[in-house]
Swiss-Prot record:
Name the record gives this protein: Large ribosomal subunit protein uL22
Alphabetized Gene3D superfamilies for the sequence: Ribosomal protein L22/L17
Record gene name: rplV
Origin: domain of life: Bacteria
Annotated GO MF terms: rRNA binding; structural constituent of ribosome
Gene Ontology biological process terms from the UniProt entry: translation
UniProt subunit comment: Part of the 50S ribosomal subunit.
Claim: Manganese is one of the keywords in the record: no
Keyword Ribonucleoprotein: yes
Organism: Xylella fastidiosa (strain M12)
Length: 113
């Protein structure tokens, strides 16, 4: 029986490149140590990823009756989301395009083997 629990945050307003830096730090850690690491990180992505990790932990507890001490982060994936395209006025009547990127963050927690 598969005891993995998943949580997904779609359309997070942070670039995937910045979110992947934080995701790489917590990949493979136990659930409790991952939340502690994210709590004290100063990056914006840490706050967003912490919410998703806590949601995945809550899903594991409620849906499968798992204990938080036995959980670890099996996979954490940051995919590209929708891009908002904006234009900024430049000199001599020109304009340049600004791309505001978003991310889809997926966290899967499961029992530590």
């Amino acid at each position: 029986m598969n005891m993995e629990a998943t949580a997904i945050l779609r359309g997070a307003r942070i670039s995937p490149q910045k979110a992947r830096l934080v995701a790489a730090q917590v990949r493979g850690l136990s659930a409790e140590s991952a939340v502690n690491l994210l709590r004290f990180s100063s990056k914006k992505a840490a706050c967003l990823i912490k919410k998703v990790v806590e949601s995945a932990i809550a899903n594991a507890e409620n849906n499968h009756g798992s204990n938080i001490d036995d959980l670890k982060i099996n996979t954490i994936i940051v995919d590209e989301g929708r891009m908002l395209k904006r234009f900024m006025a430049r000199a001599k009547g020109r304009s340049s395009r600004i791309v505001k990127r978003s991310s889809h963050i997926t966290v899967v927690v499961g029992p530590a083997k």
